[in-house]
């Protein structure tokens, strides 16, 4: 019969007498508190993957300074990492998230931290960018098996479907809660293969969760969960997944109008994808380099990156594409991406004639993507195609068609719980503003303003 563990109450860590203990990382004080509440040295050690002797040494004055050990102790006893200065606490993180704008120093520090993790070193700077994980009431199994790993993979699939069909806002809260539970399984007993598979599944889940935060407009939380995913993927030695995460970090940078920073993330991703021998992921990274170059107005670089993407797509075995890359090979998705690239070229072009030529190409690709798309393609992606189509019809002076598509897609975007979808409607508004002599265009602008002012703030950040 398995012995019942003593009480563990996560509300302990909110008590005033424990705050200085946690803030000073006084592990002896933490262990002493646990002992006073019925925990033996052996039980503490089993929870933190330490021997009874190591626990005894700590209680007798040995200091714990290693970040990974401190993190393990915090997670094992459900101590919010922020209380121990291991990551921002939920309150301080919310304060920092009021603006998604980072200082130039923040951006340099984050880029350096990502590069450090990408090359296999999780240093103190990287740990500062990890998320505060939600506490979970449910206990995790003491010993995990393949079925526990399959549960995480299955939940990843289900939340990913919700995210793609209804937007990140439909998935993010429940997904964050489940991850707070599932992440604790990393301290459970398992054989080496199962432990590695769990890390891969947790990394994929955290990447999906980061993408959902990205979609609702919370780039700060997206950055933290993607960093968390990258740490796990590197620890599990899964370079294809690491490449996918770096692609997503690149898209976060682009969402914040930082294409040069995005290129750095994507180039790190290329190293991981090539290490994995994964042409599918290499292709997606090249395609997104094209989008970053479009934001910089570098047409020749765009064409080169798209050509490289198509070459790698031709090499990829579509029957063996990783689950985190599958969507990219859905019919219509790459064509929709090309539409987005030409939409950006048009938006950033300084020459009006050239901007119109790019807009014509964007219309062609958007229409083609809509035609190619089947039920397997993300509903959100199809909505984005229509936003690109409407924007560029208006840019090419096809006013009636542009307004008609816009009215339909505004309704679609309002149904989606996607901050990206709502923010992209602004491009329709910018294009419509050039037709101020048209009553239809003016009505469209009023409709867009109404959507902007009534949308939930969490989705318009």
Locate predicted features.
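Short alpha-helical "recognition helix" segments of helix-turn-helix
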Residues: 43-46
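A short, Lys/Arg-rich alpha-helix, primarily the initiator
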Residues: 1-39, 71, 82, 93
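Short, basic-rich loop-to-helix N-cap that marks the start of a DNA-contacting helix
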Residues: 62-75
